[in-house]
Amino acid sequence: MTKVAINGFGRIGRLALRRILEVPGLEVVAINDLTDAKMLAHLFKYDSSQGRFNGEIEVKEGAFVVNGKEVKVFAEADPEKLPWGELGIDVVLECTGFFTKKEKAEAHVRAGAKKVVISAPAGNDLKTIVFNVNNEDLDGTETVISGASCTTNCLAPMAKVLNDKFGIEKGFMTTIHAYTNDQNTLDGPHRKGDFRRARAAAVSIIPNSTGAAKAIAQVIPELKGKLDGNAQRVPVPTGSVTELISVLKKNVTVEEINAAMKEAANESFGYTEDEIVSADVVGISYGSLFDATLTKIVDVDGSQLVKTVSWYDNEMSYTSQLVRTLEYFAKIAK
């Protein structure tokens, strides 16, 4: 049994516990978050985006009892002071958003944990993993890795198929992305000074940046410098879609692209020919769900622009990928 600790019990941390409860061989034995335990339990049980937890959670002194099993709860600001060694923690899922650098994340290792998976993009000194794209880059010697971002987990499988089958010369991606906690619910000063994220999240389409296109080079090195992109935050609480416009090294047809995507489908990369909308992907476990109905090609005098589209639940799709990465990472470390 792989013992897991979750540091940071926010959107991703809470959904990670839900997902891990469904995975044989993984057990969450501890959670660390500075928020009051009763508040955390309430937010875990009732979720406006993902629905009510299909199980039981109780709060006791220093612990949650989840489906009859005790999970220790800490409120320690310094991860180096956490009792990971005493608890025999194999992997920490680092979900606070504050410990995204290798040196900071290694505080968990100094506290006695064996490995750390960061639920956010990290520096170039760490391996960035998108499961079923480049997880085989891990050799078991790593102590800290990054699980990339939700958008990179959506983009990477689609980009990998295009690059492997047809070659990508260059491209530009746009994610039409649900709003998140780094935006304001009503107009007001933004903590990072962002004028657009200072505006009410649920009433506007809000242009934003994304590092997903450039970060793809950490997952697929052949694409370094070939992709860029941006984001448009839209008034939905979860459920997003990524559009990739690319110039390929060979001319293709819509049928050839869709066939290649269908052939590549797996637990991380789904394929659909249904005419779905964002509400239909809330709660899916695919990190990326390719939509064959939206593949388009513009051909002018033999020069092509190719548009491919993939859906994702920026919460649960990403969390599912993180848990797959964590499980794989733990196994190769032993």
Curated annotation (Swiss-Prot):
List of residues binding D-glyceraldehyde 3-phosphate: S149, C150, T151, T180, R197, T210, G211, R233
Gene Ontology MF term list: glyceraldehyde-3-phosphate dehydrogenase (NAD+) (phosphorylating) activity; NAD binding; NADP binding
Function: Catalyzes the oxidative phosphorylation of glyceraldehyde 3-phosphate (G3P) to 1,3-bisphosphoglycerate (BPG) using the cofactor NAD. The first reaction step involves the formation of a hemiacetal intermediate between G3P and a cysteine residue, and this hemiacetal intermediate is then oxidized to a thioester, with concomitant reduction of NAD to NADH. The reduced NADH is then exchanged with the second NAD, and the thioester is attacked by a nucleophilic inorganic phosphate to produce BPG.
Keywords: Cytoplasm, Glycolysis, NAD, Nucleotide-binding, Oxidoreductase
UniProt-annotated binding residues for NAD(+): R11, I12, D33, S119, N181, N314
Catalytic activity: D-glyceraldehyde 3-phosphate + phosphate + NAD(+) = (2R)-3-phospho-glyceroyl phosphate + NADH + H(+)
Catalytic residues in the record: C150 (nucleophile)
The family this protein is said to belong to: Belongs to the glyceraldehyde-3-phosphate dehydrogenase family.
Annotated Gene Ontology cellular component terms: cytoplasm
EC number(s) recorded for this UniProt protein: 1.2.1.12
Annotated protein name in UniProt: Glyceraldehyde-3-phosphate dehydrogenase
Biological processes, Gene Ontology terms: glucose metabolic process; glycolytic process
Pathway(s) served: Carbohydrate degradation; glycolysis; pyruvate from D-glyceraldehyde 3-phosphate: step 1/5
Subunit description: Homotetramer.
Entry's localization field: Cytoplasm
Name of a matching Pfam family: Gp_dh_N
Class of enzymatic activity (EC top level): oxidoreductase
Site (Activates thiol group during catalysis): H177
